[in-house]
Amino acid sequence: MEATIESRIGLKELADKVVSADQAAALISNGDVVGMSGFTRAGDAKVVPMALVERAKTEKFKIDVYTGASLGPEVDQFLAQAGVIRKRGPFQGDKGIRTLINNGEILFADMHLSHGAEQFRQEIFGPMKYAILEAAAITADGYLIPTTSVGNNPIIADVAENIIIELNISHPESLIGIHDIYVPEKQGERQAIPLTNASDRIGEKGIKIDPSKIKAIVISQEPDAPSLIVPPDEETQTMANYLLDFFSSEIKAGRLTKTLAPIQSGVGSVANAVLDGFADSEFEHLQVFSEVLQDAVFNLIDAGKVDFASATSITLSEELGKRVYENLDQYADKLVLRPQEISNHPEVIRRLGLISINTALEADIYGNVNSTHVSGSKMMNGIGGSGDFARNARLGIFVTKSYAKGGSISSIVPMVPHVDHTEHDVDVIVTEQGVADLRGLAPKERVPLIINNCAHPDFKEQLWEYYNAAVEATGNAQTPHILNRAFEMYDLLEKTGSMKK
């Protein structure tokens, strides 16, 4: 056995468990429920899933796949297109699998990311036969050291009947010590989660495992798929500037200080642009308590703006990832990776008083937000953690451009055809047109703010015409709607290719 591999397997009785990816994949049977590591391209199982794809070329079988969040795009895509996946959850981010979900070939269980662990404990999806978990090391005292994400790995390792480990020796050993693995007690016996600051460490260095459950160890050197951060354009930069101005106004109102509150930011170019904007802002000594740490977080650490960052995953561009992982020791005292059961836990989010920034597909004139379903029917990626954060944060902020498809679609509509975040969970909406602060407002007070500040000028007249007609038709009801007209813009889109009258 190579010295590098031997040094990563501290439990020497496991040395004879090292097998090929094909041998490990052969252990999985048709109909199995399989848990896999992976959260937004990071720390995902890679080589055994691809061996399953190869196996599917000569053998017909299907499995249910549950993870922390999305796997690397190739893994989800190839598993789906090989016909291996019957059902998938709780989140995905690949066009290939999305197409098969939306034509009915794959079932998809979309859920709040904080809910997964409890559902696995209760075997809601059935007994989990196998876990396939990427690890940087297995320590002599029986801890599995995750790589660049933790996600649902602790609970998957606990409930799975059998475990396959992908020992990825391309990840640096300096990852040891980055993780903080805390698993709550059973419901009904549970104590308060003792986390009162984003930088607190409350758990253990790795995932305690039962060695008897480990059926195979596969050596991997496959890197994580790098993030594809789209550089901010003029409009995303404008949105970022609006948000920074909003935070400044909150300081003037006495609700925040220059350190703000711990920040949660969703994945994507707008969120990254907002974080980048902090570099030249008045804000300082910031903390991040999020799901995913993107490029901008490390740039802010380097700039001395962020003191500490907590998440469940690190997802970086290729260039920055190389620099960070080659110098991980420099960040060790400023980072922690936790299970998503903790990073997304409502109790912790409420206690820390987070500022939550997530992306919407669209919002309606009363402040309801659709994050998941295009035209109400076709799944995009999933709700992810946006619901965990929006409902429980100090500030639940949603960002979106005011239009889509070159201006033929309005992102502000009379009534969203699918609701992920109700009007009660949405504090602020930001588009490139402006900001709507909805806190404390009645439905009819929100309408002028959302239409005037956030809607694209091409659609404002249509939106006002609908609202005024709804007020008249309902006798000025609490939340005026004309149900047989509420989706007129979608009817127009379907018939003409545009929402414009």
Where on the chain are the PLM-derived regions?
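Conserved alpha/beta enzyme-core scaffold
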Residues: 1-501
